[in-house]
Amino acid sequence: MYKIQLLSCIALTLALVANGAPTSSSTGNTMKEVKSLLLDLQLLLEKVKNPENLKLSRMHTFNFYVPKVNATELKHLKCLLEELKLLEEVLNLAPSKNLNPREIKDSMDNIKRIVLELQGSETGFTCEYDDATVKAVEFLNKWITFCQSIYSTMT
């Protein structure tokens, strides 16, 4: 009598696991990754906002796109990934004591790695960008706010 219910429960569990339904351990890993991404973005923002770099006006003239809608899901990280290459190129235009090319590359590689891990196998999402653009500081602030929002919903 209970065989059918048990088999249904097992089948449903397997289907959820196969489709990547979050488990408590994956949620814990996701929280750690989001926290790491948040810290990396904050560190990058500190370097960009450094008064020494503010004198390098070229870096602060470039525009970046942000998603048209408020980014609220991990799939929106694809939009960050698409703009990250431009940010790296812009930061390399203005080398200074606290923005050396090696550190920039390491930081960007780490951010890319984390974003790719958080995205998982999500490939069907297409970013829609706002018509208005933002400068580097505001761009980083928006993604920091995104990470804080995601992190707070997971706790």
UniProtKB/Swiss-Prot annotation:
Compartments, as annotated in UniProt: Secreted
Main localization, broad class: secreted
Position of the signal peptide: 1-20
One GO MF term: interleukin-2 receptor binding
Superkingdom of source: Eukaryota
InterPro entries the record matches: 4_helix_cytokine-like_core, IL-2, IL-2_CS
Glycosylation sites: T23
Cysteines joined through disulfide linkages: C79-C127
A GO CC term assigned to this protein in UniProt: extracellular space
Keyword field: Adaptive immunity, Cytokine, Disulfide bond, Glycoprotein, Growth factor, Immunity, Secreted, Signal
PROSITE patterns assigned to the protein according to its UniProt record, in alphabetical order: INTERLEUKIN_2 (PS00424)
GO biological process, alphabetically ordered: adaptive immune response; positive regulation of biosynthetic process
Function: Cytokine produced by activated CD4-positive helper T-cells and to a lesser extend activated CD8-positive T-cells and natural killer (NK) cells that plays pivotal roles in the immune response and tolerance. Binds to a receptor complex composed of either the high-affinity trimeric IL-2R (IL2RA/CD25, IL2RB/CD122 and IL2RG/CD132) or the low-affinity dimeric IL-2R (IL2RB and IL2RG). Interaction with the receptor leads to oligomerization and conformation changes in the IL-2R subunits resulting in downstream signaling starting with phosphorylation of JAK1 and JAK3.
Name assigned to this protein: Interleukin-2
Species for this entry: Bubalus carabanensis (Swamp type water buffalo)
Taxonomic lineage of the native organism: Eukaryota, Metazoa, Chordata, Craniata, Vertebrata
